[in-house]
Amino acid sequence: MDSITSAASVVAAGLAVGLAAIGPGIGQGTASGGAVEGIARQPEAEGKIRGTLLLSLAFMESLTIYGLVVALVLLFANPFAG
């Protein structure tokens, strides 16, 4: 693998993880804030809100994991290596 392809793969892997973490990070903060506000308004609905929050946080975190998988493929099983 030539040095340009190798360097571009490392940069792309870093961008994949970094950019894949921005959206879910913002979404998780917003969802958690909304859940805290909802529990503060209706404490009796805490169990239902918490369950829904945890499920949605898991779905959001899966987007970051997909970015990590793309980065690992670029680093260790590079399809552009030729």
UniProtKB/Swiss-Prot annotation:
Keyword Transmembrane helix attached: yes
SUPFAM superfamilies on file: F1F0 ATP synthase subunit C
CC per GO annotation: plasma membrane-derived thylakoid membrane; proton-transporting ATP synthase complex; proton-transporting two-sector ATPase complex, proton-transporting domain
Residues that span the membrane, as ranges: 7-27, 57-77
Keywords, alphabetical: ATP synthesis, CF(0), Hydrogen ion transport, Ion transport, Lipid-binding, Membrane, Thylakoid, Transmembrane, Transmembrane helix, Transport
GO molecular-function term, one example from the UniProt record: proton-transporting ATP synthase activity, rotational mechanism
Topology versus the membrane: Multi-pass membrane protein
Subcellular location: Cellular thylakoid membrane
Main localization category: membrane
Sites marked Reversibly protonated during proton transport: 61
Gene3D superfamilies recorded: F1F0 ATP synthase subunit C
Pfam family of the protein (one): ATP-synt_C
Main function: F(1)F(0) ATP synthase produces ATP from ADP in the presence of a proton or sodium gradient. F-type ATPases consist of two structural domains, F(1) containing the extramembraneous catalytic core and F(0) containing the membrane proton channel, linked together by a central stalk and a peripheral stalk. During catalysis, ATP synthesis in the catalytic domain of F(1) is coupled via a rotary mechanism of the central stalk subunits to proton translocation. Key component of the F(0) channel; it plays a direct role in translocation across the membrane. A homomeric c-ring of between 10-14 subunits forms the central stalk rotor element with the F(1) delta and epsilon subunits.
Summary of subunit composition and partner proteins: F-type ATPases have 2 components, F(1) - the catalytic core - and F(0) - the membrane proton channel. F(1) has five subunits: alpha(3), beta(3), gamma(1), delta(1), epsilon(1). F(0) has four main subunits: a(1), b(1), b'(1) and c(10-14). The alpha and beta chains form an alternating ring which encloses part of the gamma chain. F(1) is attached to F(0) by a central stalk formed by the gamma and epsilon chains, while a peripheral stalk is formed by the delta, b and b' chains.
Family: Belongs to the ATPase C chain family.
Database matches in HAMAP family: ATP_synth_c_bact
Protein name (database record): ATP synthase subunit c
Organism annotation: Synechococcus sp. (strain RCC307)
Name of the gene encoding the protein in the UniProt record: atpE
